[in-house]
């Protein structure tokens, strides 16, 4: 039984990585088409709210508990939802204006490093003397060598791009992606203590709802600056929201829930997300005609993927 569950979880994890990778490719497609990056960043989440609401209705998950949980810690929900979603996605689409999608996907793996380093900011439930307590998480020291490997892999891919984009573009993109890589795990980790009673889909819906006013204001700014988005931008951002924001999220949560009883198997399923980079490269080659600038980038990708897999397996 466990073997069949693991096989199912493995396939779901791989599919989730594929749907997650679509984000990086479509962002590059929109950039090439001249779509304004602020529209690209806001429309995904404007689409996601009704899509997630529809999903909750299909799955018959109640909505009232979501509002009760948000109301009980409104300030925290607004703050960390905006950091985790707005602070994550806007810098990512901004960087996609200057760098190819596969490279954005590669640099984005820095979020694994910052996810581990921000562990002490999270409190996890533990039983102490027969009573439940929230205990501050610790940085798993066994992961540190593999975090260095990931950083080296990212560095090689970035160095390989030097000379193909202007230095200031590379620098500002790297800074933006670094900020996004910190904001995403930090926002999500700080929300977790307030979302203990919610399912994964309910939590994503709640965070999207709390960040929605910000995305609406940003879309108004985009409208005033460049006018309404094109039909192509609307369609592409819809597919990004559907693919990455809904389908991939649901698949990944389902995959992890199947093996949640075994931390070793859970780590192996989480390691499938290293395939985001692989799928981004393959899709870039097939649909965008992307090529590597030099062998440093190939080496960097190999090191990066190896590091991502090992940091999960060694937890």
Walk through the language-model features, giving the residues of each.
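Loop-to-transmembrane alpha-helix entry segments
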Residues: 105-108, 124-156, 170-171, 261, ...
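Transmembrane alpha-helices of multi-pass small-molecule transport proteins
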Residues: 35-87, 114-119, 149, 179-187, ...
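Specific alpha-helical transmembrane segments that line the substrate/conduction pathway
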Residues: 39, 46, 93-141, 264-286
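Helix-helix packing/entry segments at the starts of transmembrane helices
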Residues: 16-17, 43, 103-110, 194-211, ...
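Specific transmembrane alpha-helical segments of multi-pass solute transporters/efflux pumps
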Residues: 19, 60-108, 156, 243-261
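Glycine-/small-residue-enriched transmembrane alpha-helix faces in small-molecule transporters
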Residues: 1-43, 94, 145-155, 163-193, ...
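Hydrophobic/small/kink-forming positions within alpha-helical transmembrane segments
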Residues: 21, 25, 82-86, 90, ...
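C-terminal-most transmembrane helix of multi-pass membrane proteins
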Residues: 45, 266, 270-315
């Amino acid at each position: 039984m466990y073997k069949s569950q693991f096989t199912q979880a493995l396939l779901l994890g791989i599919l989730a990585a594929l749907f997650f990778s679509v984000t990086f490719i479509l962002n590059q497609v929109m950039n090439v088409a001249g779509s304004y990056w602020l529209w690209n960043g806001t429309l995904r989440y404007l689409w996601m709210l009704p899509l997630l609401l529809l999903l909750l209705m299909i799955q018959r998950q109640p909505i009232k508990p979501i509002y009760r949980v948000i109301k009980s810690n409104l300030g925290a929900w607004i703050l960390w939802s905006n950091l985790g979603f707005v602070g994550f996605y806007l810098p990512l689409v901004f960087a996609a204006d200057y760098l190819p999608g596969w490279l954005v996907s590669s640099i984005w793996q820095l979020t694994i490093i910052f996810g581990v380093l921000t562990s002490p900011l999270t409190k996890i439930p533990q039983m102490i003397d027969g009573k439940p307590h929230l205990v501050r998480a610790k940085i798993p020291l066994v992961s540190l060598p593999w975090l260095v490997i990931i950083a080296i892999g990212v560095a090689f891919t970035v160095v390989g791009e030097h000379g193909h984009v202007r230095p200031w573009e590379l620098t500002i993109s790297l800074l933006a992606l670094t900020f996004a890589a910190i904001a995403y795990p930090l926002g999500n980790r700080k929300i977790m203590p307030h979302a203990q009673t919610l399912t994964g889909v309910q939590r994503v819906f709640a965070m999207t709802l709390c960040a929605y006013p910000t995305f609406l204001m940003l879309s108004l700014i985009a409208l005033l600056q460049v006018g309404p988005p094109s039909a192509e931008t609307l369609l592409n951002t819809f597919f990004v929201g559907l693919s990455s924001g809904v389908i991939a999220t649901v698949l990944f949560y389902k995959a992890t829930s199947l093996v949640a009883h075994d931390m070793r198997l859970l780590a192996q399923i989480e390691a499938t997300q290293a395939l985001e980079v692989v799928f981004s490269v393959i899709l870039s080659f097939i649909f965008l005609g992307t090529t590597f600038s030099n062998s440093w980038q190939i080496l960097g990708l190999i090191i990066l993927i190896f590091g991502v897999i090992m940091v999960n397996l060694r937890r």
